[in-house]
């Protein structure tokens, strides 16, 4: 357990340039608190102490804004940055060295029983606001762009953006932008910029107002 906690703290320093000290990370990083609370809740869940497990997970949700079902299986060095609004479903599995930003949902698509949440591989980055839904698999070394909605399985070494999510980079063949979270395309932003360009053309008389969109 202590080794796991040390690894989690190390992951924070590797991923967040704002982290300045171990004391700061331990006392103020809500994502870390949510992950450590989940370790306790998950152990209780595996021992069929479901009510106690849910009580811990709900208490963690109250203090951190991050909801992780105690049944979810989480690998080593999970970094939840900012974290508010993150939801991780009961049958979800997450590999090692995964980074999740605020507003991410790893959820289901209906009221089906059994396996209904996604599996996330190793070394995956899931940017802010993304939704990965259903019994699908996100393989290792994948990047999910901000506000994407992913409904199908994704192969390794790819970058996915958009609604619905589609591959813009695979196996080193760059179609979209770079690996860095800050440079991943934002579909909503791009749509707004497109509308602004169309409005500017309309003002200049290049197109009729009826055909702006």
From Swiss-Prot:
Gene (name only): cysE
Top EC group: transferase
Protein name in UniProt: Serine acetyltransferase
Coiled coil: none
Any one GO BP annotation for this protein: cysteine biosynthetic process from serine
Annotated metabolic or biological route of this protein: Amino-acid biosynthesis; L-cysteine biosynthesis; L-cysteine from L-serine: step 1/2
Protein's UniProt keywords contain Metal-binding: no
Family: Belongs to the transferase hexapeptide repeat family.
GO MF annotations, alphabetized: serine O-acetyltransferase activity
Keywords: Acyltransferase, Amino-acid biosynthesis, Cysteine biosynthesis, Cytoplasm, Repeat, Transferase
EC number: 2.3.1.30
Species: Staphylococcus epidermidis (strain ATCC 35984 / DSM 28319 / BCRC 17069 / CCUG 31568 / BM 3577 / RP62A)
CDD domains noted in UniProt: LbH_SAT
Pfam families: Hexapep (PF00132), Hexapep_2 (PF14602)
